[in-house]
Amino acid sequence: FKVTPALLHRTVKALILGDLLMKCLYRVRPYEVEKGAANRLYEQWDVIVREALEHHGFSKTAAKTPWLKRRYLPYPVLAREIVKSFDALPLKDVPRKVRVGVVGEILVKYQPDANNHVVDVIESQDCEAVVPGIMEFMTTRPYITDWNEKYLGTGGNKTLYALMRWSLDRYNAPIKAAIATSHGKFKQDDPMPELVEKAAEVTSIGVQAGEGWLLTAEILELIEQGCPNVICAQPFACLPNHVTGRGMFG
C-alpha cells in the first residue's frame, strides 16, 4: 500500500477512537449490571467505527442499530455517540473499585497474549484497569523539540512540528468535548505538554530509548488521577524499558 495524506488522516482518527473505546470499556465493564453488556457494546462500535472510517463516515451497521439509527457518523459524532452509549450503560450502584494502571513496553502493554491477559486478571480480582492510550506514545516527538534542540542540537523542523501539534489539537478536540458530556465518568487525558513537565520533574526528557520519559509521565498521571497501583509490563529483552520502568519505580 501507499502512505497518502488520506490514509494518515484515517489512521490518526482510528488510533484516537480506539483509545476512546478502550477508555470507555475499561471504565464501565467492572460495574456492568448485565454481564457481557459492555463487551457487546464495544463489539458493535468496533464494527461501526471500522465502517465509518473506511466509507467516509457512512456505516450500514449504525443505520440498523436501534439505539443509533443513523447512517452518517462523521468523526465528532462518532466520538460523541461512543461516550453517550457507554455513559448510558446500566451500572451497579457500588463504590468505585480499586484502580490498577498498566504501563510499559508498547506491545506488552496492549497485547493480551503478551501480558498474560493482565486486564482480565485485574478485573477478576474485583478491580478496575486503567490503561493510557497509544496516541501518547505515537505523538511524543513534536512536544520535545525544544529540549532536543537545546541539548542535542537536533530539534528537527520546528514549523513541521508546530503544524503537527496544531493538527493533533484539532483531532483531539472532539474527543475532549465528548468526554466532557459524561460529567466526570470518563477522565480527560492530560495534555502532552503537561506530561512532558511531569516527567521532567522526576527524570530527564533525554531518556528517549524505548518508552523513555513517557513511561514515567504515565505513572505520574495515573497516580494523580487516583490510581496509585501501577503494573509496569515489559518483555525480558527490552533493556531500555527495564531501566526507565524499574528505575522510576525505585
Region spans (language model):
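An N-terminal assembly and electron-transfer interface module characteristic of large anaerobic redox
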Residues: 1-250
